Amino acid sequence: GILLFGYVAGARSRHITMNGPVHILLEEEEEQTENIEVKPGEQIEKSAWITVEKSEAKVQVRVKVLADGIMAPQQRDLLENIQMDENWFYCEKDGYFYCAEKLCEGKKVHFQAKITVPPKWKEWTEDLQFRLELAADGV
């Protein structure tokens, strides 16, 4: 089976990234409870609010979806199966999703990714266990 780790009931995780004078806050809320088993073709949702806490100029917010516990080819499989809304675009060169609109201090934007577990993963015989995390910063 394929096990997705680290979904905590009603947990709100907060991460602040400081890149010089730019401070970005990422807040995630998860509805699921414990580790869940996912099947090939199933959809996983990851969403977060991203706030520009501090910045002198308008900043472009970017988010990386990190998959821990699986190899690079499987990570690529997952990233190829992500659907985003039209406010975000993916840059293959660096693996980040960029917000189309630049934000000024105090503004927040919603990031929501629908990730489909690759259907070809059903050919795997060994168990897969992984965790999905989001990381945000501003450029």
Show which residues each predicted segment covers.
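Surface-exposed, hydrophilic segments of mature proteins
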Residues: 1-139
